Amino acid sequence: KESAAAKFERQHIDSSTSSVSSSNYCNEMMTSRNLTQDRCKPVNTFVHESLADVQAVCSQKNVACKNGQTNCYQSYSAMSITDCRETGNSKYPNCAYQTTQAEKHIIVACEGNPYVPVHYDASV
């Protein structure tokens, strides 16, 4: 079974692209990362930084998660991210996404030993 850390990496890390030029990016990535297998995942964020840089956020600014848990961490610096949001005419299995690029601080939930990101909480 896929570990929580591996799942986070599959769903949220795309170090190979520093910026997204194609409006088709989300449609391609959401499919290739298996985020549209049994339903269209409504919202997903990809982070265009190295896995090591994203894992390092677990030792940065401790903040509360949206659900009230205290194991969330905000990155000290802004990171290059792409938000994928399902469009109104998207219908499974033909999931369709809007691609929006931004530079934002990311907030992730961390757990385990080693202490690594397991959930993408927000961007600020």
Swiss-Prot record:
- Keyword terms: Disulfide bond, Endonuclease, Glycoprotein, Hydrolase, Lyase, Nuclease, Secreted
Q: Does the keyword Hydrolase apply?
A: yes
Q: Which SUPFAM superfamilies match?
A: RNase A-like
Q: Which residues bind substrate?
A: K7, R10, K41, P42, V43, N44, T45, K66, R85
Q: Spans of biased composition, class Basic and acidic residues?
A: 1-13
Task: Tell me where in or outside the cell this protein is found.
Answer: Secreted
Q: Which GO terms describe its biological process?
A: defense response to Gram-positive bacterium
Any one GO cellular component localisation term in the record: extracellular region
Kindly report the protein's main subcellular placement as a broad class.
secreted
**UniProt key word Nucleotidyltransferase:** no
Q: Where is the active site?
A: H12 (proton acceptor), H119 (proton donor)
Give the catalytic activity. Answer: an [RNA] containing cytidine + H2O = an [RNA]-3'-cytidine-3'-phosphate + a 5'-hydroxy-ribonucleotide-3'-[RNA]; an [RNA] containing uridine + H2O = an [RNA]-3'-uridine-3'-phosphate + a 5'-hydroxy-ribonucleotide-3'-[RNA]
Tell me the function of this protein.
Endonuclease that catalyzes the cleavage of RNA on the 3' side of pyrimidine nucleotides. Acts on single-stranded and double-stranded RNA.
* Family, as annotated: Belongs to the pancreatic ribonuclease family.
**Record's subunit section:** Monomer. Interacts with and forms tight 1:1 complexes with RNH1. Dimerization of two such complexes may occur. Interaction with RNH1 inhibits this protein.
In Swiss-Prot or TrEMBL terms, this protein is called Ribonuclease pancreatic
* Gene name linked to the record: RNASE1
